[in-house]
């Protein structure tokens, strides 16, 4: 079950990043560009995305 949950979290994270990539046409290469991304995207949307990534990454 743990492996399945990990795979699910990875797929959901990839889907999230794919949606973000399609909407803003930005390539997630490093954390240095996070400021540029936050300035491009809406603050509320960026906060929601970061929260989602934190939750998915925190899960085992």
From Swiss-Prot:
Note: Part of the mercury resistance operon (mer).
Keyword vocabulary terms for this entry: Mercuric resistance, Plasmid, Transposable element
GO biological process: response to mercury ion
Listed name of the protein: Putative mercuric resistance protein
């Amino acid at each position: 079950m743990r492996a399945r949950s990990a795979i699910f979290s990875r797929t959901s994270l990839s889907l999230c990043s794919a949606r973000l990539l399609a909407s803003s046409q930005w390539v997630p290469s490093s954390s240095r560009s996070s400021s540029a991304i936050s300035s491009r995207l809406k603050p509320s949307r960026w906060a929601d995305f970061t929260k989602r990534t934190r939750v998915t990454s925190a899960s085992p």
